[in-house]
Amino acid sequence: MRQLDKNQQGALQQSAFRPLQQTAFQALQHSASLKGLLKPFKGNRELAQLAEQCEVLEQGLLELAQGLLAQVRRPPFTLLPARLIEQRTSARTTFLRWQHIATRRMGVGVWAEMLRQDKTPEYLLQDLYQMELQRITLNMQISLIHSIGKQAAECAEKMGQAEAEFMGRLQQSQTRPGSVGM
């Protein structure tokens, strides 16, 4: 990545946008740990707990995204031709997307186009860049946690079905007269 010289850095000082800092993530880090992800799960309860932990983490990340959106819903960002919005997906999660106000077109291309326009004030370029980095990071974190939680919930259900089949077979063996194990 190309380094900016001192004059460019001075002209592009960040001002209106405050990116999320490590302290914003600390509560999420301490609320649930995924270090137990790589272990031999003994049953559907442990997987269901992992799915619940992921759901709590995802909600925490979405709250951080709300804080980000609150910033961009204030001037000077409300004067720009594009805005950052929430988009709910069919997979029942939410991501941050750029949307052009006039055309409703969405995507990172809208952000890039806004950055290239001479109408976009130079003093906002650093803020817009930091917003995009924050958007990318939060979307990645939300996606990962959502996927892990979804997989954990599906596996918990499959383990529950396997247990039901197993228990059904054991009960069948116990009720059958003269049944002998193999």
Mark where each language-model region is.
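Long, compositionally biased, intrinsically disordered regions
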Residues: 2-25
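Intrinsically disordered, low-complexity linkers and terminal tails enriched in Pro/Gly
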Residues: 1-9, 90, 177-182
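Negatively charged, low-complexity tracts enriched in Asp/Glu with abundant Ser/Thr
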Residues: 8, 26-79, 174, 178
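Amphipathic, interaction-prone secondary-structure segments
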Residues: 66-101
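Amphipathic alpha-helical coiled-coil segments
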Residues: 54-64, 68, 124, 128-152, ...
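Coiled-coil heptad-register positions
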Residues: 65, 69-72, 76, 146, ...
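Helical coiled-coil/dimerization "stalks"
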Residues: 80-88, 165-182
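Intrinsically disordered, low-complexity regulatory segments enriched in Ser/Thr/Pro
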Residues: 95-137
